[in-house]
Design a protein with these regions (language model features):
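Substrate-binding clefts and catalytic carboxylate motifs of secreted carbohydrate-active enzymes
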Residues: 127, 140-147, 154-187, 196-198, ...
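Short aromatic-acidic-glycine turn motif
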Residues: 15-17, 357-376
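Exposed beta-strand face motif in extracellular beta-rich ectodomains
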Residues: 335, 387, 395-401
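Short, hydrophobic beta-strand segments
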Residues: 376-395
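Short, aromatic- and glycine-rich surface loops/edge beta-strands on solvent-exposed regions
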Residues: 1-2, 307, 397-401
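Active-site mouth of glycoside hydrolases
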Residues: 1-203, 207-221, 231-235
Length: 401
């Protein structure tokens, strides 16, 4: 025996329909979801498996049953967490555009190459990543769709024929590699008319105003609102969902033919478009919920929100950890440390003193090294009386912070 691997897999059956929505194991299920980027504050994309599980559980705790992996193949650990937590997952390929049609080198460059000499290599890369995503993740029962792209229409007009041709090739490849799951076109709300891309796959996801555009109402194929909301807010934000365009005709209430809807987005994240564009999460970059997260938890699970921090004098700090022992030191595990500010009566207050955490003894590090400082005017934020960071160690021992 030269090599051996074990894979854990499960049984389920699903059906996406054009007129009655989505069915799981024979029962109708409206997909209530969130888009999730997998980078974390301080650590970027170097996220531990524990951090990925924490993210999935936070979305589940809020009452969501669906995650859209935006907009690239997520780690196998993230998908395994979806399997074990009972979270349905839309796995997306790394072919996306963001708000523009400029030349290469700009953050809002054309999603598809403008120059002809770059197209063959780009096509190969997109199809290779799609094939690798399917082969790596295909045994995960949580995955209910393979998505070819997100908003690939953000391409120069001269490149749109190439976009359509590549999407057709990706759909064919997806069907060949896994005929049991539908091939989705994500962020397919443009263009309109005869040049539509939403009908190129088996299911369509519409972002933003795509959820209310007449062309995409009962489009003739299974569909969902793959993004709504896009509310920019620093924590704590408003105790409200931010339905965005879905508010205009009460589409947020759900339609019988629509399979579901996913908020943009679950967590704040890094963005090539700048920090403001990365603050649309219902949970902040450090994994502290904004008030919108509590709104969803109340709406979907009936759990009342906590008492909000009050104005008052900061008299003491409370340091908590999500676990205290049994933490692995192989780079796959971490602990979440949270600092809270209280007054003399033990009430949470909204004051924002500057706080420094330091490793006094033992192994372990923050993304900034052996100490980290939170302040109100820093990217490492103390806000509304709270701050948090993930802490990890690569050697055994007892860490004292």
């Amino acid at each position: 025996v030269l090599d051996r691997t074990e894979t854990v897999w499960g049984f389920r059956w699903m059906e996406w329909t054009a007129d009655k929505g989505f069915f799981l194991n024979g029962k109708h299920l409206y997909l209530r979801g969130a888009n999730v980027h997998q980078d974390h504050a301080g650590w970027g994309d170097a996220v531990t498996e524990a951090g990925m599980w924490r993210d999935v559980r936070m979305m589940k705790e809020a009452g969501f049953n669906f995650i859209r992996g935006s907009h690239y193949p997520h780690s196998p650990a993230f998908v395994e967490a979806c399997d074990r937590e009972g979270m349905l997952f839309w796995s997306e390929n790394a072919f996306w555009g963001i708000g523009g049609f400029r030349a290469d080198g700009y953050w809002n460059a054309s999603a598809y190459p403008v120059e002809a000499e770059g197209r063959a290599g780009f096509d190969r890369s997109v199809k290779t990543q799609l094939a690798e995503m399917i082969r790596i993740h295909r045994n995960h029962p949580s995955i209910i769709a393979w998505s070819m792209c997100n908003e690939a229409f953000f391409s120069a007009p001269a490149a749109m024929d190439g976009v359509r041709a590549l999407l057709k090739e990706c759909v064919a490849l997806s069907r060949q590699l896994d005929p049991t799951r539908p091939a989705a076109i994500g962020g397919a709300q443009r263009p309109l008319g005869k040049d539509r891309i939403d009908l190129l796959g088996d299911i369509a996801g519409y972002n933003g105003d795509g959820g209310i555009i007449p062309d995409f109402q009962q489009p003739g194929i299974p569909s969902m609102v793959s993004e709504y909301g896009s509310v920019t807010a620093d924590r704590p934000g408003k105790y409200a969902p931010g339905w965005g365009d879905l508010q205009k005709n009460e589409a947020y209430k759900g339609l019988p033919w629509r399979s579901g809807q996913a908020v943009w987005c679950g967590f704040d994240h890094g963005s090539i478009a700048g920090s403001v564009m990365g603050k649309m999460g219902i949970v902040d970059y450090f994994r502290i919920p904004k008030r919108a997260w509590y709104w969803y938890r109340k709406a979907y699970r009936g759990v009342e929100p906590p008492t909000w921090p009050v104005e008052g004098k900061a008299e003491r700090l409370v340091l908590t950890s999500d676990k205290h022992e049994g933490v692995r030191t192989d780079g796959t595990d971490d602990v979440m440390l949270q600092v809270g500010v209280q007054d003399a009566a033990g009430r949470d207050v909204s004051g924002n003193p500057t706080v420094t955490l330091t490793v006094v003894s033992g192994p372990g590090e923050f993304p900034t090294g052996r100490s980290i400082t939170f302040s109100v005017d820093s990217d490492i934020r103390m806000a509304n009386g709270k701050a948090a960071i993930e802490f990890r160690a690569y050697e055994a021992g007892t860490a004292v912070v």
